[in-house]
Amino acid sequence: MTTQIYQVPVVSNGLRETESILQIVDSLEKLEKVFNDMYSTISARVSHEKSRIDNVANRLNNAQHKVNQIVGSKQAITVFSSAKYPADKKWGDYVPIYSGKHKLPFKPSHYHGLNSEDSPIKKRPEDSYLDVNDLVFIEKSIDTTSKEVEVKEGLGRIPAQIPSVSNLLLFNTQENPYKKYSNTLDNLSGGDGGEDDYTIFGDQLSKKKRLGDAPVTVKDGDSRIDAENVKIGYEPGTFEIPVYNFPSILPLPNVAENITWAAESQSIAPSQKATLNLLPTYDNSNSGSAPVNQSSGGDNNVNNNNNNNNSNNSTGIMQPPQPTNAPPPPPPPPQSANAPPPPPPPPVSAPPPFNPPSVNSNNDDDDDDDDDNGGGGGPGGAIGDLLADIRRGHKNRLKKADVGGDNGDGEDNKPPPVSDGGGGLMGDLFKKLALRRQSIATTKSTKKQSKSKKEDTDDQDGESDTDSSEWE
């Protein structure tokens, strides 16, 4: 769409005076309207662009004011940037001023007569045009006399289509061949100097211009440079590196001094400070009860062993040491309804009296020997036997029962009562335990007899030694 939307009528020639005046007035009015419209449009665009410039200037002033407030402060400053990076600015196409306006229709002025009434045009005599013809002739004669007579000395008229000014000039000269041209002018012909270097060009003498020297590739040819004689490697020189001593903090202007400043704001990842309870926590009192009881039980066993050893040493009988690293006893099995309740524990104040070894040993000795051998000496099985483990679990209860039998009841050699309700798992286990105890009792009785004989011989040897020492 064309941007030329205004049209101004031009006063035509050959009109009467009144028509000429009216057309002149119409043309001036139209020109004034066009002028006002153009300048109002331009003023509106200028004011719009000026408002944009003022907005940018205000933003610059605000930024400069903030910078001026920061300048001079020696404290560290936190600068917060937007979370989203600003998008690329989209530059819009330039909109012309008159792009939204359309070309106005042209209304020429038409005047046909001086009178307002419709009257036919009267033919004027030819004498009335003589003065006008004289004026036209005089104007033409003035134009012809003012023009210079063109002399045909060049190549002719300048062509209508010339791409540039360089095409208008002669090569390597500043002369226009279309205006002045000499056939004797030859820039390529060399001269020896003197008068031959000057050529008559028109009425002036023009000095011939020599061409520049040919390039090296034309003079010497396409010869390649010898690469062996050319050093293209880097050869650094030896020099001492300067040593500078600067303080840790330079007193520079407009530079923060508190380098070790720490932000007081909340971290962007607060979950790092939280401690996660990934592992279960245990109470120290509950968790340490088992090992404490175990250690206390071990200490009690050690004390009991020491007491037994001391008592045995006092009577001259050596007892085998009891195991102190025995595993903790398993929980007791559930008792049946027909089983009698366990006997009460013995009094703690007075320990039970020690009985000398004899052929018919009690069940408490059997239990001690069984503990020493670990259940591996009998014909029943090995240490890891299930029945032996169950028996070890009931060791304390059985010992209490045996201690109660030493008071003279005479029932310490009897096996524990077995429930008559056959077919149950616990009943079978108790039967197996009874058989096991009987087999162990028979084997232990023989061991006790051999052991007592050995101790008697040792006592006799000791008495003989004392007698010999007395005689000496």
UniProtKB/Swiss-Prot annotation:
Classification via PROSITE patterns: WH2 (PS51082)
GO molecular-function terms, A-Z: actin binding; alpha-tubulin binding; gamma-tubulin binding
Biased composition (Polar residues): 282-299
InterPro entries the record matches: WASH1, WASH1_WAHD, WH2_dom
Biased composition (Acidic residues): 363-373, 457-472
Pro residues biased stretches: 320-356
Keywords recorded for this protein, A-Z: Actin-binding
Sequence ranges of Gly residues compositional bias: 374-383
Ranges for domain WH2: 382-401
Example of a GO biological process term: actin filament polymerization
Ranges of biased composition (kind: Low complexity): 300-314
Residues spanning the signal sequence: none
Name of one Pfam family that matches: WASH_WAHD
Stretch list, region Disordered: 279-472
GO cellular-component term (any): phagolysosome
Family to which this protein belongs: Belongs to the WASH1 family.
Function: Acts as a nucleation-promoting factor by activating the Arp2/3 complex to induce actin polymerization.
Protein name: WAS protein family homolog DDB_G0292878
Annotated source species: Dictyostelium discoideum
